[in-house]
Amino acid sequence: MMPTETFGRTGHRSTRTIFGAAAFSDVTQAEADRTMELLLRFGVNHIDTAASYGDSELRLGPWIEQHRAGFFLATKTGERTSQAAYDQIRRSLERLRVDQVDLIQLHNLVDPAEWETALGPGGALEAAIRAREEGLVRFIGVTGHGTTVAAMHTRALERFDFDTVLLPYNYPMMQNPIYAADFEELLARCRERGVAVQTIKAITRAPWSDRPQTAATWYEPLRDPVAIDRAVHWVLGRPGIFLNTVGDIGVLPMVLDAADRFRERPSGDAMREIAEQQAMEPLFV
């Protein structure tokens, strides 16, 4: 059964496996509809999308319109200035066919200059606060990629009391001692404050490099069912964090199935074995 946990201070009892709707960036409505039926069968009750995810918000709209009460709904703005971010939030609501989203997130906020702009006077954070005051959003979060993101999120929590954070977490990346230490510091801070921690890139195998891109993801995902099981169970085996699913509807069913069968975290030896067998590499260095 899909495990659930309270999503930080929001109070929502979310499935620990969150649907990463980047998977809907470039699919037909029929493909999106079949995927949404799959989510309902597995009991997933939390969706994470973004304004920059192609057609994702548009594909979600018809379903959200009919099933709004069944999902915690999050989107993101990648704009860095207040008015541009506010306008994008309003467009996201229109595309999603809702009057309010549960969570708005400042998208991929890692670059120091962009960070200062977004969190400073006239920045995107002001738009998120305004949207919350107007009832367009309920909570505010921050997301990011890369090896510095955990440290940047810790800094962000000193600047503003964000409700959620989102960042990479997988076995290869946590072998980087600096990133691992930064992640642990962030996680401790989030636990103190009741901040929900979402994680991405659980089933990353490696960067595409020169290999043909055979999935919708911008990294090469694991395909072997045993490897996917171990990667997913390794993430879910860490208490207090959520797993946002892969951005490819073809790989998604294996991730959902693995999450549904989660019982315990694989051992370090088991993860080292699968990492070697699959030639897993960190996506960010």
Q: What are the roles of these predicted feature ranges?
A:
Residues 1-71, 127:
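N-terminal binding-site loop/beta-alpha segment at the start of enzyme catalytic domains
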Residues 93-116:
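Active-site groove signature of glycoside hydrolases
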Residues 7, 19, 47, 60, ...:
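Conserved, mostly hydrophobic/aromatic
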Residues 27-40, 82-97, 147-157, 226-232:
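Short, acidic/polar
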Residues 70-81, 103-107, 167-169:
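A short, structured active-site edge motif that brings together acidic residues
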